[in-house]
Regions:
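Active-site- or binding-pocket-proximal scaffold segments within functional domains
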Residues: 1-265
Length: 265
């Protein structure tokens, strides 16, 4: 049993993101956690990492080497989770593991956003974002209120040859960091509680019951979403078109009136 967790940009355990909460709730001694890009080193290196996502490949390399080490000793349940850029890092790790004929039991993604290389890079060269066939179950929580241009969400699309993976995606009220669990805790608990449910549906069972109960009782779907942060003007431009819920997409906290206003066919 092993979990590999990749946090979002600038996130550390102090932020208590949903990724860290899941990592902390997983009952195993085989646990890997990586802070988000922009959380390490000097002030200047943090700024550069925050803008470019630099360091993502180092995190993948470290996790992959640990996976190989653990796999040589016994076959084990493999869970990978990530938030924001960490969710894109999680996808690439899943692809590397599946290339080695490994299996991923559960891939949990919170609002995947790339922009590796520069804030306007939507290609993310070197990062495979499609879900490979070696992943048994993939779940992604999506933010409906995020409007920043460089925060375009990456949907959980299957690789061309993949007809096996179960995929569940669900839209939540709140901006990017609300869904990731670092701002509004009531909205963050909604996506966390849903992700725990998806992980259990994927037949992973090493979760601390107290953490599951705490997530469930903390859900507040009526909490007001946070404002989109506008700091660095170039990095945080608002998009010309907000994210839209398409026909057939799942909505969590569907009774939230602000969620209903974002629906489109």
């Amino acid at each position: 049993m092993a979990i590999y967790a990749f946090d979002g940009t600038t996130c550390t355990p102090r932020n208590l993101s949903n990724v860290f909460r899941m990592y902390d709730a997983y009952k195993s001694r085989h646990k890997f956690y990586a802070t988000g890009p922009g959380s390490r080193g000097t002030w200047l290196s943090k700024v550069i990492e925050s803008m470019t996502g630099h360091g993502g490949k180092d995190r993948i390399y470290d996790a992959f080497e640990i996976w190989k080490y653990w796999q040589t000793r016994e076959s084990r349940e493999t869970i990978i989770i990530g938030f924001s850029r960490g969710a894109v890092i999680a996808r690439e790790l899943a692809n590397k593991i599946c290339e080695e004929d490994g299996k991923v039991d559960f891939l949990g993604l919170y609002d995947s956003v790339g922009s590796f290389g520069n804030p306007f890079n939507m290609i993310d060269i070197g990062y495979r974002k499609s879900i490979p066939s070696g992943v048994a179950y993939c779940a992604q929580a999506l933010s409906i209120h995020e409007e920043r241009f460089t925060f375009r969400v990456i949907r959980a699309n299957l690789a061309k040859e993949n007809t096996e993976t179960t995929v569940q995606e669900c839209w939540f009220p709140g901006v990017h960091s609300d869904v990731g669990g670092t701002l509004k805790k009531g909205l963050g608990a909604a996506s966390l509680n849903w992700m725990f449910e998806q992980a259990i549906n994927a037949n992973t069972n090493q979760w601390d019951k107290e953490a599951l109960d705490e997530a469930e009782k903390s859900v507040d779907c009526e909490e007001e979403p946070s404002e989109n942060k506008i700091s660095l003007p170039v990095c945080f431009l608002r998009s010309l078109r907000t994210r839209k819920i398409k026909e057939g997409d799942s909505r969590c906290c569907a009774d939230n009136p602000q969620l209903a206003t974002r629906t489109t066919s």
